[in-house]
């Protein structure tokens, strides 16, 4: 930066008394135009090769990165598609399991209700049988008591009505009947 300032200060302080002016030199050989052109062409050729190879390498890297990205995108889309298929299958399996569970629960509930009804019917039958047995036993007890009371009553009436004469006749009658068997 300082050198640019020095150049400008030299040009500004240049003595104009010498009648020097800036002009275009038409002599190509003295002006080194050919050398400058050759230098520029050489630089362009070298830089073209250098920059061209760098740009080609860069372009190849970018294209390779794009291809890799596209390949990863294809793989990701493939995995996504496969995952969506698996999700759909899983949802179908879950729906089927839920349906089977509901069916099984309904069957179990119905089985429990049927078993409960059968148990109630058994209890009713057992209760009826128990009641019938109790009725028979009570009837037998009543009959025994009625019979016992009747025998006591008849015995009491007989004791009141049978005289010793009647008693002797009954005994003789029974002996006579037994005598025929002996």
UniProtKB/Swiss-Prot annotation:
Q: Extract one GO cellular component term from the record.
A: proton-transporting ATP synthase complex
Compartments where located: Plastid, Chloroplast thylakoid membrane
Q: How does it sit in the membrane?
A: Single-pass membrane protein
Q: Show the InterPro entries listed in the entry.
A: ATP_synth_b/b'su_bac/chlpt (IPR002146)
One of the Pfam families matching this protein, by short name: ATP-synt_B
Which function does this protein serve? F(1)F(0) ATP synthase produces ATP from ADP in the presence of a proton or sodium gradient. F-type ATPases consist of two structural domains, F(1) containing the extramembraneous catalytic core and F(0) containing the membrane proton channel, linked together by a central stalk and a peripheral stalk. During catalysis, ATP synthesis in the catalytic domain of F(1) is coupled via a rotary mechanism of the central stalk subunits to proton translocation. Component of the F(0) channel, it forms part of the peripheral stalk, linking F(1) to F(0).
PANTHER family in UniProt: ATP SYNTHASE SUBUNIT B, CHLOROPLASTIC (PTHR34264:SF3)
Q: What family does the entry list?
A: Belongs to the ATPase B chain family.
**What other facts are recorded?**
In plastids the F-type ATPase is also known as CF(1)CF(0).
Name recorded for this polypeptide: ATP synthase subunit b, chloroplastic
Q: Which organism is it from?
A: Gracilaria tenuistipitata var. liui
